[in-house]
């Protein structure tokens, strides 16, 4: 079965390039057709590479379904459902980081520092985004969401230090890409649209997912 993963990982990259082409050309029909194939392919690649790593491909599945909901981003309720599915995927990543790198046994001061930094990061994002997102509820939702991105980025750094394994920095890189992608998505959805908006959103999103998945896979047996 692992042979299939060696086919599916390159297929994911090929499909990503094709999808990004349609994003750049603003071909809505084929952009919407190709988008759901991306995380489905990546999730299947993980499944065939390491069937026991079910949480990794379950997180990909939540992103796959979330992608489908976000195709209807003009409907605010559907957009919220899609965002919630991505939040579940991030929570799965949080659990993986804590359980895989023994973060559950680290000193409580690490969590105190996390709490302080998360509050600071959330407040900074809340006020930085203010010129681009006037609605208080939407700005609050954005700030809370990116706090989860920050938490996973923080845990990936702590995991790197605890395990002496720099491969966890791939997960950090992934969450930096996620922050760029989701910030662009929020601004263009709730403030002002830009030409070819889907190209930078999807480019950074796909780099984020690939970095995170590779980070978890490459640290499987370490």
Predicted region positions:
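Polytopic alpha-helical membrane-helix bundles and their juxtamembrane interface segments
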Residues: 1-222
